[in-house]
Design a protein with these regions (language model features):
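Hydrophobic anchor at the beta1->P-loop junction of P-loop NTPases
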Residues: 7
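P-loop (Walker A) phosphate-binding loop of NTP-binding proteins
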Residues: 10
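Conserved lysine of the Walker
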Residues: 15
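Hydrophobic positions on the alpha1 helix immediately C-terminal to the Walker A/P-loop
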Residues: 18
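Conserved substrate/cofactor phosphate-moiety recognition/catalytic segment
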Residues: 24-67, 72, 101
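Glycine-rich phosphate-binding loop used to anchor ATP phosphates in small-molecule kinases
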Residues: 62-130
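A glycine- and Lys/Arg-enriched "phosphate-lid" helix/loop adjacent to the NTP-binding pocket
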Residues: 100-171
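NTP-dependent small-molecule kinase module
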Residues: 147-274
């Protein structure tokens, strides 16, 4: 059962750079990395739809399709991590939880109906799959600094991102962290004296420390019969099971959930791109 770590932060907060440095610090093959699937969102389906660009150009119209696709991508990644039982630490660029809790809420053009749909889908997937993060590393970055980085890297799909949106996103991240039941380690990354390598080392040591704490706690729970970390012998093939408990019950299988999210994805690809 992997230990899921989510690297969170605003747009251009340095998540990708941090993950790159963490790769170099990883001591062995037990660290597995899952970057955000941005390229997938820019080439969806046979028509190669750039859903990310469409969202930034018209966030009111395409926020729900994008956030739905983001959730689908994250479920697929976390299923892959779950099935890699030898992996002790899985590092994800952003958590599943932030899709509905941050980005859906941060869009001022999101209608109440769209927010409800995003939240309902999020709740369904949380209940029926293993998408929970064990720890969140949050890169706290000033919105103005993020805007400067966005301007510098000059990605076509980000050219309409403005300071107001980034400030709104920043505020929703703060609220998300305040509400979160998941342990959060906040790292300030605006200090020009600190290198990416120094920030990565801080994150690396935090992850190792929290993993040790989690492992000690989990061992006690196993001994007390509270949960079973992997699939018991009487269950079906482990690569089709999301979670098994000692009494033999199980959540919805990965196979069934995959079919559900594929149906949702097919609906996304029918989006009006005119």
């Amino acid at each position: 059962m992997p230990f899921n770590v989510a690297i969170e932060g605003s747009i251009a907060s340095g998540k990708s750079s941090l993950i790159k440095e963490l790769r170099s610090l990883a001591e062995d093959d037990n660290w597995k990395f899952f970057p955000e699937q941005v390229e997938q969102w820019k080439r969806l389906g046979p028509r190669r739809i750039n859903l990310l660009k469409m969202f930034y150009q018209n966030p009111g119209k395409y926020a729900l399709p994008l956030q739905t696709q983001v959730m689908i991508s994250k479920v697929e990644q976390m299923q892959e991590a779950w099935n890699s039982y030898s992996t002790h630490i899985a590092i994800f660029e952003r958590s599943f939880e932030s899709s509905a809790e941050v980005f859906a809420r941060a869009n001022p053009l999101f209608s109440e109906v769209e927010k409800t749909i995003a939240q309902n889908l999020s709740d369904f997937l949380i209940e029926n799959t293993e998408v929970d993060s064990d720890v969140i590393i949050y890169l706290d970055t000033d919105p103005e600094q993020c805007l400067k980085r966005i301007s510098k890297r000059d990605r076509p799909e980000e050219r309409k991102v403005d300071l107001n949106y980034l400030e709104n996103l920043h505020d929703h991240y703060k609220s998300f962290i305040a509400r979160s039941k998941i342990p959060v380690r906040i790292i300030k990354v605006d200090d020009p004296e600190r290198s990416v390598k120094q920030i990565a080392l801080e994150a690396y040591e935090s992850i190792k420390s929290m993993l040790e704490t989690s492992t000690d706690s989990s061992s006690e729970e196993v001994e007390n019969g509270k949960f079973y970390p992997l699939c018991p012998p009487n269950c079906r093939d482990t690569d089709q099971v999301s979670l098994c408990t000692l009494n033999g019950s199980q959540t919805t299988s990965s196979e069934a959930v995959s079919e559900t999210v594929k149906e949702v994805q097919n609906e996304i690809l029918k989006v009006d791109i005119e």
